[in-house]
Amino acid sequence: MATSPSSCDCLVGVPTGPTLASTCGGSAFMLFMGLLEVFIRSQCDLEDPCGRASTRFRSEPDYEYDFIVIGGGSAGSVVASRLSEVPQWKVLLIEAGGDEPVGAQIPSMFLNFIGSDIDYRYNTEPERMACLSSMEQRCYWPRGKVLGGTSVMNGMMYIRGNREDYDDWAAQGNPGWSYQDVLPFFKKSEDNLELDAVGTEYHAKGGLLPVGKFPYNPPLSYALLKAGEEMGFSVQDLNGQNSTGFMIAQMTARNGIRYSSARAFLRPARMRNNLHILLNTTVTKVLIHPGTKNVVGVEVSDQFGSMRKILVKKEVIVSGGAVNSPQILLLSGVGPKEDLQKVNVRPVHHLPGVGKNLHNHVAYFTNFFIDDADTAPLNWATAMEYLLFRDGLMSGTGISDVTAKMATRWADRPNLPDLQLYFGGYLASCARTGQVGELLSNNSRAIQIFPAVLNPKSRGYITLRSADPLDPPRIFANYLTDERDVKTLVEGIKFAIRLSQTSPLKQYGMRLDKTVVKGCESHAFASDAYWECAVRQNTGPENHQAGSCKMGPSHDPMAVVNHELRVHGVRGLRVMDTSIMPKVTAGNTHAPAVMIAEKGAYLLKRAWGAKVURVDATWTLHRVI
């Protein structure tokens, strides 16, 4: 157990970002959360006033840099950190948001910051076939507007996807992206805290990103594993040899503390004089010479609306994620010519695939009740257990770190997982009463199982709303427009119900919530037709958006970048984030985003003559800058 230090070696600054109390809405629990935040800010390993990258924050950028990285999120933080390892390169990282709030370091509070000031709070355009019960039939897309991006507010689950995901990328004309090619870059970043348990063939120690299990899991977590075994599944590392089964996942955390990409990669680089960071600054466009199509710099707007141009010597890297990366390219005049002209953006380079191929995992929240009167409340006793020892309810995410992957009859290939189960409940957050998994009127508690489609067939796209860079883009998700996605979800729901009927979960009195979904009253409850209706009414988009700047060869009309992540037809411009995925990986996308950034930084170093890492036949990556 980790005991936090009692004093810091430097002054604690002003609070950054939304507070825990402000994220609790009108809850009567706000006073407790406000006091809790005071105690949290006195904990040096949580507040980390000495370790934050604030020494690199700049109010005024220099005139010119070797590299400019747009977006300090899950991938951009990694790219900037790795490029600044070369001391003769001057690197600028530009982030539209501010620094990460201290409350986000607490695992149990991970849902608090969705919808807060560090969230872009995107909504899709009205959906035809999904989110039908939502206001105006719009799906909500939380995306991090903060240093560290969505890794500051995600569930922290470290999932790499299937081996076949990457082999398929390579087979589509992207050499260097097979599973064997990318595994060293997963291992490069990884500091696995349980290496003896998972082995060295697929995992490594010594990287910047801590990966390990939370200190605490509710007893129900282990019952879920037993339930999976009763149904014939193994409990195993889904990032290893096999990707089918159940597990308590490893997380991007250490000692009960979240490690965002900013905390893991930028804070260790904070003393490098060649790394500068601009916060609260929006890139309005990448500056591209219309004749040569060479990138010359970027145009930015600070939080007060002041505009300036910053020049680049070598390359600009766009790492805004699957929503903002295509938006930045479009604002820069790179994209479908006809779409740009509609919003009065001057086309610089016609590239029809920008914003296309957008897709995301899609889920359905299946509600259950359990009988459990022994759960402890979130009170000062449990808070002190976390503050003093980084253990207990607040050191984890309840049962949300349990997951399972499996193949349905709709899978493209036998035994290739196309469905993932997530679980929700026992979350120590700001509930109405302060009780973890609050008691309902019948003395039961609610938990959720939500199956997610890992290989969605439905495709959407992103376009500009206007030429104003502060206008959110128009997002057409087109969820469930391919019937195969609906069929896979229904299979997942029926599996979740069967799981609830196993003996380990029957001991909890687990039972399906039979409240009829509004709009589905005409269907027999729990029939396939009923569930097909339900998933369209109460659609649950995951936060794993991908594909909108697709990687592919030049003969692919929808490809935006090549296998070296260079934007087709533009010199000095690359994209490095999940938007380059030809097809989204089968699982949470944070670990693949970090891998893409690691490989992208490697490609940049190699292209510009820096010493680079060598990959040997055993897939070991030797760390040489």
UniProtKB/Swiss-Prot annotation:
Location relative to the cell: Secreted
What reaction gets catalysed by this protein? a quinone + D-glucose = D-glucono-1,5-lactone + a quinol
- Lineage per the UniProt record: Eukaryota, Metazoa, Ecdysozoa, Arthropoda, Hexapoda
- What cofactor does this protein call for? FAD
The text of the family note is: Belongs to the GMC oxidoreductase family.
- UniProt keyword Repeat, yes or no: no
One Gene Ontology cellular component: extracellular region
List the catalytic residues: H544
**Enzyme class at the top of the EC tree:** oxidoreductase
Q: Which residues are FAD-binding? A: 66-95
Q: Which domain of life is it from?
A: Eukaryota
Q: Give any GO molecular function from the UniProt entry.
A: flavin adenine dinucleotide binding
| Keywords recorded for this protein, A-Z | FAD, Flavoprotein, Oxidoreductase, Secreted, Selenocysteine, Signal
Q: List the EC numbers from the record.
A: 1.1.5.9
Pfam families annotated for this entry? GMC_oxred_C, GMC_oxred_N
The signal peptide stretch is 1-42
- What is the protein name for this chain? Glucose dehydrogenase [FAD, quinone]
